[in-house]
Structures are given as structure tokens and as C-alpha cells.
Amino acid sequence: MNIVILAAGMGKRMNSALPKVLHPVAGQPMLSHVLDTARTLSPSRLVVVVGHGAELVRKAVGADDVAFAEQAQQLGTGHAVMQALPLLDDSQPTLVLYGDVPLTSVDTLKGLVQAAGAERLGVLTVEMPDPTGYGRIVRDAAGNIVRIVEQKDASEDVRAIREINTGIIVCPTAHLRQWLATLRNDNSQGEYYLTDTIERAVNDGVEVVSAQPAALWETLGVNSKVQLAEIERIHQRNIAQRLLEAGVTLLDPARIDVRGELTCGRDVTIDVGCVFEGRVHLEDGVSVGAHCVVRNTTIGAGARIQPFCHFEDAKVGPDGRIGPYARLRPGTELGQDVHIGNFVEIKNSQIADHSKANHLAYVGDATVGQRVNIGAGTITCNYDGVNKHRTVLEDDVFIGSDTQLVAPVTVRRGATIGAGTTLTKEAPADKLTLSRAKQMTLDAWQRPVKQPKK
């Protein structure tokens, strides 16, 4: 099968410099959603017709399996498909999709392709309560489709029809090539309509059949930011529905955003306002508090994530206790039963089982052993202005509050670092190491007194 995706439109009503098909739904361009769906049909030729912002579109979705055709002037959908003809295989049917209609399901497209077979022209249609703005499906007395009439060219009788054309069609490519060559632009828009091929098919004795999607929202397109927001909510609602059906507890299904792939084990609970980006996996019994942002992260079984945490490219071990207001940056790997508390930032560090940094700390480029306690205000001073250096804290180390660990530095097994220490050399095992200025009391000192204003 050939698949052609039309993605040349400017999208004036979007009021944006970004090509319309690159506006995101669930964190990825609308066009990427359409391409992902198209790929599940295993097409032999996959062609994207670009126009406005062509280079941006090529850069965003270019891949080895995608060919591009350019529509320099946007002269209608029929004209757009004409640009793809040199790239198509006449021995196989062609399916036409739209880069700004991102939610059409694979099952719906398979149903349309199956209905059309190898010799018929298939049209995806829906009935709408208010069909204003859409091309109407005109049938004869026997119920056969005879033509599609666009809204601006329709009579009052035709405008009363509620069955509309979604624009998605499939037909034999050799016929399509012949029909497109005969299109005229003598209509109110001055464009070459792809829908006019239906009347050509009828005249040539090619049967025209229709199929319908499982839900109306599958065929909704995006022409404005309002419609983009509506599509986003529909998509997120569908994701939430699938999560609920899989056994995930969502404290408010209307307040979750998945911008990638979220997989969950059993008995997972997600509070309101959470955002999941990229590939995220939550193992059995995980609880995620309100308003967390989690990107490309695995969270181990039984972990409890408190509200307002941010994770990116991280791994949380089983039974972890994280947050609130904790940040795990790329390269963070936490072992079992690790506690990371409020206003703690971890970056490119490995922290082994049962270790804790409960509040107000920065741990960067560090290797932390088991049962380590990192006191409040501890900082790994990992950057010298040019290079990053590592800090090593071996098992059973205790770091007192307000300690600066100036990397590269190692604290040996069982060592204790006194509060307020600036550590610049290795601390030996099982000993107390500290550095601090001599404490003094000045008996003759007087606090300055602020003079009253005159």
C-alpha cells in the first residue's frame, strides 16, 4: 500500500510561525502521530506532502522510510496529492491521510482499507449533528455515494445532509492518477478538490464504498489553537481511560498528562496534575503525589513520590521515599529504600541502598554507598569552572550538616564528617574529620544602633 500524508498547509488561524502539523499533541507533533499510525499499516511507500515550512517539517519527521513531495503553491487537496504521484506504486492502492488529523485509529483505517479492497474507492465518512463547514456525502436513491459537495458549493438541500466527508480516502493508484489529471478548479475556492475524484469514479463505473470510525473524535482536524486544545483533552482522556482499565488509580482522570509512553504495574496510584514525558515505567505499588513531572524514568516497586517532584532520565529503586520538591536530574540511579527529601537535587549520581539525603542538599557526580546519611545543606562541589569531578562516599558514612565536599574527594567507609566542614582531602575510615574556624566571643563588642529618623 502507498500512504500519502498531506502536510503542506500554513494554518493561518493558528497565528504561529510554526507549521501547523508540527504543533504538539501529547508532546509530539501532530504529524508524528499520523506517521506512527501509518507505519502500523506497513506501507511500501510513505510520502509526506510538504509546503509551508517545508524544511522545518522535513527536519522534524525525516526518516529513512519517509519520502517527501513538495507543494510549492497550496492549490487544494487534489493538487497536493498530484505532487506525490511520481513516488507512488501503481500496482498498490493509495491511502490519503492528513497531518492535522492526529487521532484516527489503526482499526478505523484497517476497516476502510478492507472495505475498499483492491478495486473500489473507499471514503471515511461520519454523521455530525452540525455538519457546517464540511463536504457533504451525496447518495442516490439506492444509497450509493455519487459525489461529495463542499460546503461553499452546496445548495440548501445538500447542506441539510449530515453525513460528511472526513477527507480520508483509499483507492487504486492507477485510477487515482487518471482522475487527478481531469480535475478542474472552477469552484468557489479556485482549488483542485480531491473529493471530485468520487464523481470521476462513479462515472468510470468504480464502486464507491464508505466506512465509519468508532468515534467522531477520530476524524477531528486542527485549524486553530482552540481545536488543538480540544484534541489534546480528547487524547489525554483516552489515555486516562486506558490506564484506568489497566487497573491504575487516577485520583482525577481529567488531570493527568501523558506526553509519551507510560506503563504501570499493579496497584499504582497517581494524584492530580502529574505530567509524564518520554518513556516512564511505574512498577507495582508506586504512588506518585500531586503535580510531579516525570520524564524518561523508571520508579521501582513500592516507591512513594511526594508532591512537586521533577525527575528526568533517572531510576528510582524499590521502596524509595522521594520528595516533596525533590529533583532527580539525568544519570541519577537510586537503590532500594533511598530517601531523598525536600529541596534535594541529585545529578549524575549513584546512591546505594538505605542511604538518605533528607533536605536541602546538592549531590552531583557522586558515588554514594549503602546506609549513608547526607546532612542538610551538604554540597558536592563538583565543578572547577572547566571540568566536573566525582565525589565518593563509601558505605556507612555520615556527613554533617552544611558540609562542602570539594571534588575530587573520597570519604572512606564509616567516616564521620563534622558539621560545617569544607573537605578537600580524603577522609579516613571510621574517624571524625572536620574543619572549622576557632570560635571567639568579643566581650567589648557592641551591636550598632540604628539612629531614629528625624
Swiss-Prot record:
Residues binding acetyl-CoA: A376, N382, Y383, S401, A419, R436
Subcellular location: Cytoplasm
InterPro entries documented for this protein: Bifunctional_GlmU, GlmU-like, GlmU_C_LbH, Hexapep, MobA-like_NTP_Trfase, Nucleotide-diphossugar_trans, Trimer_LpxA-like_sf
Pfam family, one: Hexapep_2
Main location: cytoplasm
Region (Linker): 226-246
GO biological process: cell morphogenesis; cell wall organization; lipid A biosynthetic process; peptidoglycan biosynthetic process; regulation of cell shape; UDP-N-acetylglucosamine biosynthetic process
Cofactor: Mg(2+)
Keywords tagged on the record: Acyltransferase, Cell shape, Cell wall biogenesis/degradation, Cytoplasm, Magnesium, Metal-binding, Multifunctional enzyme, Nucleotidyltransferase, Peptidoglycan synthesis, Repeat, Transferase
Reactions the enzyme catalyzes: alpha-D-glucosamine 1-phosphate + acetyl-CoA = N-acetyl-alpha-D-glucosamine 1-phosphate + CoA + H(+); N-acetyl-alpha-D-glucosamine 1-phosphate + UTP + H(+) = UDP-N-acetyl-alpha-D-glucosamine + diphosphate
Any GO molecular function: UDP-N-acetylglucosamine diphosphorylase activity
Cofactor binding: number and manner: Binds 1 Mg(2+) ion per subunit.
Binding site for UDP-N-acetyl-alpha-D-glucosamine: 6-9, 20, 71, 76-77, 98-100, 135, 150, 165, 223, 329, 347, 362, 373
Source superkingdom: Bacteria
Gene3D superfamilies: Hexapeptide repeat proteins, Spore Coat Polysaccharide Biosynthesis Protein SpsA, Chain A
Keyword Iron assigned: no
CDD domains according to UniProt: GT2_GlmU_N_bac (cd02540), LbH_GlmU_C (cd03353)
Spans annotated as N-acetyltransferase: 247-454
EC number of this enzyme: 2.7.7.23, 2.3.1.157
Record-listed Mg(2+) binding positions: D100, N223
Gene Ontology CC, one term: cytoplasm
NCBIfam families xref list: glmU
HAMAP family, per database record: GlmU
Purpose of the protein: Catalyzes the last two sequential reactions in the de novo biosynthetic pathway for UDP-N-acetylglucosamine (UDP-GlcNAc). The C-terminal domain catalyzes the transfer of acetyl group from acetyl coenzyme A to glucosamine-1-phosphate (GlcN-1-P) to produce N-acetylglucosamine-1-phosphate (GlcNAc-1-P), which is converted into UDP-GlcNAc by the transfer of uridine 5-monophosphate (from uridine 5-triphosphate), a reaction catalyzed by the N-terminal domain.
Subunit structure: Homotrimer.
Protein name per Swiss-Prot or TrEMBL: Bifunctional protein GlmU
